[in-house]
Amino acid sequence: MIRICPTVEEERALRAAGYRAIAGLDEAGRGCLAGPVVAAAVILPDAVIDTPDVLDGVADSKMLSPAQRADLFERITSLAVAWAVGATPAHIIDSHGILPATRLAMQVALLRLPRPADALLIDAVTLDNWPLPQRALIKGDARCLSIAAASIIAKVTRDRLMDALDACWPQYGFASHKGYGTVQHQQALRRYGPTPHHRRTFRPLCDWLATDAADEGLADGTGRSIL
C-alpha cells in the first residue's frame, strides 16, 4: 500500500493569515465495539512547519506499525508546542451517538492544551459553535501534518488505554484487537457478554442484545445474564 506523505500547506496558509497556534485534531476508535473514542490536539512549532522533514515518517496512524507509532509519539510530543488528549467513554457514546461523542473528545483535548489554539485543522468533522477558525479536511490525517500528528497521539493513547482494560478483562483480548470487531472479539462477546466498556448501540452487539432478550439471554462479562 502506498503511503501518502502529509504536507504543511494548510498550516502555512493559516500562518500567512496571521495565526500562530494552529492545532491539528484527529480521533481514534470511532468504529470500535468497545472502549472510548479518543481525540488528540497537537500544535506544531514554526520550526516544524518551516522544515517538516524533522518529523519525517509521520503519516495517517492507520498506515504505521505499532513500533513506528510509538517512536513517532515520542518525537511528536517532544517537539510539539502543546498537545493534549480527550476521551469519551462507551456509555456516553451510547447515549449521545458517536459523532457528538467524537466532537466532545476533541473539545476536551482543546480545553486541556497548555497553550490555547487560535485556529483548527480537523480530520473530516467541524466543531459546531466552537469560537475558532477551523477547516475540516477529508482524509486530513493523510494530507495535513498537524492532523497526522494528532492521529498518532490519539491512536497510541487509545491503544494504551485498551491495554489497561485488557488487564482487567483478559478474556476479551483487548490488547490484541483494541476493541475492534474481530472474530476473536465477537466470539468472546458471545461467550462472556458485554462489559461496561462495550458500546451497546453498535452492531452486532445491539442486534444480539435485542434477539437474546427473547432467547436465553446474553451474559454480562462474568457469565451472569443481564436480560
Swiss-Prot record:
GO terms for molecular function: manganese ion binding; RNA binding; RNA-DNA hybrid ribonuclease activity. Its main location: cytoplasm. GO terms for cellular component: cytoplasm; ribonuclease H2 complex. It comes from the Bacteria. Residues 20-214 form the RNase H type-2 domain. It catalyses: Endonucleolytic cleavage to 5'-phosphomonoester. Keywords: Cytoplasm, Endonuclease, Hydrolase, Manganese, Metal-binding, Nuclease. A divalent metal cation binds at D26, E27, D123. Its EC number is 3.1.26.4. Its cofactor is Mn(2+); Mg(2+). InterPro entries: RNase_HII, RNase_HII/HIII, RNase_HII/HIII_dom, RNaseH-like_sf, RNaseH_sf. It is found in: Cytoplasm. It is an enzyme of class 3 (hydrolase). Manganese or magnesium. Binds 1 divalent metal ion per monomer in the absence of substrate. May bind a second metal ion after substrate binding. GO terms for biological process: DNA replication, removal of RNA primer; mismatch repair. Belongs to the RNase HII family. PANTHER family: RIBONUCLEASE H2 SUBUNIT A, RIBONUCLEASE HII. HAMAP family: RNase_HII_B. Endonuclease that specifically degrades the RNA of RNA-DNA hybrids. This is Ribonuclease HII. It comes from Roseiflexus sp. (strain RS-1).
